[in-house]
Amino acid sequence: DIPNKNLNEIDCSEVLLSAGLPILKPILIKDIEDLSSYFKEGKDKYVMKIVSSDIQHKTDIGGVVLNIDNLDLAKKSYQDIFKNVKDSAPNAHIDGIMISPMKNGDIECILGAKIDPVFGPIVMFGLGGIYAEVMKDIVFAEAPVSKQKAEQMILSLKSKDLFYGARGKPPIEINSLLNAIINLSNFIAANSDKVDQVEMNPILVSETE
């Protein structure tokens, strides 16, 4: 069941995982000493982010730290994030800090859904990451979408060649991407009375091996 409120990152992850979206399940940290229990040192790198439904653009206020690869850096990042948020958003309710392993991908995409006042449930897909607002290479479709419609969405992008192999590069894992678009479209269509909008940016898609 979806709570009737703005959801934080942890809540959103649980909901989207249950909807069949390929989300990495984050860990919620509420005390700096808990980092030693959860943080795994080694070759992996992690991201830490403030958890608050009151703060939309967390990177802008120093609420996100990337490439954390040891416990000392994790503890410093924890302290820095809280200080930055306290300085920039002193009235925001803070649920803690999430930590999640960083993953690499070949293309950063944006995937979202919303309830349009005219068309109803809508799913959105396009080039994401730092390019989402610059390139504006995004397409929309009424939800739910079929596999054929999801592929038409990708083919409608100006950047479509990136997904199907450009200049000798292999294509991306298209079926996993199609499933993500389809599953989110099914989710927004089934929960149009409970969900206003969902946005995931970036989602990382990888080339086929």
Predicted regions and their residues:
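ATP-dependent carboxylate/acyl-activation modules
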Residues: 1-209
